[in-house]
């Protein structure tokens, strides 16, 4: 990571935060216009963002639960008819505990939390976890967000699952997969995330562990035309325009 990422700031008011993070992550603190690194973590007046450098670099990446695409999805995303809401089984279990093994930018977890789910997000990549935590902390400024049950832990999902003692009603996973034809926004995010994080090559191992740890079901988000993950066949599949949700139903313990 030291060869690809550096820390910077766009306002002197956030210099001390940038210096602190650079020390914590053992990364260089550079000028805002530096092009010596593939990515810059930038402290702006509004938020923490990830920028790609270069002449054809996509726009910055940051987490905002209060406005933009994420907030729009909360208000106009289709309510309980959304595939992800149906896939996690809210009809039969209205307020489930959900373990999201691949939190990413937190969008799916945010949707589920808005429907009364108690969601624990797991993110293994420290940079993505920083962006997500920054978005969570800024959203605490509004009362309705404070009431959501949404928590983040930065840890490798395999390590967390292998030592997990409690049972979650649902374990959810959206592993990184090859870029397909999507909207400009998703293309930008996928390009940045894939360069930074890479593919989730351990998705089959995570599925095998999740099937042993979940109480009611395991839900895997997949590209519409892709094969299911290696292992047992899903019991139910919810198909959308470009993606689908493979659902593995678990029998109650005797």
From Swiss-Prot:
Q: Please list the residues that bind S-adenosyl-L-methionine.
A: 107-108, 123-124, 174
Catalysis: reaction(s): guanosine(1516) in 16S rRNA + S-adenosyl-L-methionine = N(2)-methylguanosine(1516) in 16S rRNA + S-adenosyl-L-homocysteine + H(+)
Q: GO molecular function, one example?
A: rRNA (guanine-N2-)-methyltransferase activity
Give the GO cellular component terms, alphabetically: cytoplasm
Enzyme Commission identifier(s): 2.1.1.242
Q: What is its main location?
A: cytoplasm
The record's subcellular locations are: Cytoplasm
Q: Which UniProt keywords apply?
A: Cytoplasm, Methyltransferase, rRNA processing, S-adenosyl-L-methionine, Transferase
The superkingdom of the source organism is Bacteria
Which class of enzymes does this protein belong to?
transferase
Q: Does the keyword Methyltransferase apply?
A: yes
Q: Do you know which HAMAP family this protein is assigned to?
A: 16SrRNA_methyltr_J (MF_01523)
Q: What family is reported?
A: Belongs to the methyltransferase superfamily. RsmJ family.
What's its job? Specifically methylates the guanosine in position 1516 of 16S rRNA.
Name this polypeptide is given: Ribosomal RNA small subunit methyltransferase J
Q: Which organism is it from?
A: Coxiella burnetii (strain Dugway 5J108-111)
Gene encoding this chain? rsmJ
């Amino acid at each position: 990571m030291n060869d690809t990422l550096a820390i910077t700031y766009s306002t002197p008011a956030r210099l001390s935060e940038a210096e602190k993070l650079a020390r914590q992550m053992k990364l260089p603190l550079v000028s805002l216009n530096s092009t010596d690194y593939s990515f810059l973590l930038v402290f702006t007046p509004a938020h923490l963002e990830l920028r790609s450098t270069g002449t054809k670099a996509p726009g910055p990446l940051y987490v905002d639960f209060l406005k933009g695409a994420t907030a729009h999805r909360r208000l106009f995303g289709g309510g309980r008819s959304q595939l992800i809401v149906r896939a996690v089984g809210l009809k039969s279990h209205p307020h489930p505990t959900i373990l999201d093994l691949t939190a990413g930018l937190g969008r799916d977890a945010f949707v589920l939390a808005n429907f009364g789910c108690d969601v624990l997000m797991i993110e293994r990549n420290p940079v993505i976890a920083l962006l997500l935590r920054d978005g969570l902390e800024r959203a605490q400024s509004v009362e309705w967000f404070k009431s959501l049950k949404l928590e983040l832990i930065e840890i490798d999902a395999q390590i967390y699952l292998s030592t997990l003692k409690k049972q979650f009603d649902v374990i959810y996973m959206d592993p990184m997969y090859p870029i397909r034809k999507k909207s400009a926004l998703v293309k930008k995010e996928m390009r940045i995330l894939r360069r930074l994080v890479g593919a989730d090559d351990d998705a089959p191992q995570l599925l095998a562990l999740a099937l042993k740890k979940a109480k009611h079901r395991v839900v895997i988000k997949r590209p519409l035309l892709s094969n299911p993950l290696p292992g047992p066949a899903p019991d139910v599949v919810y198909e959308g325009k470009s993606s689908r949700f493979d659902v593995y139903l678990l029998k109650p313990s005797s």
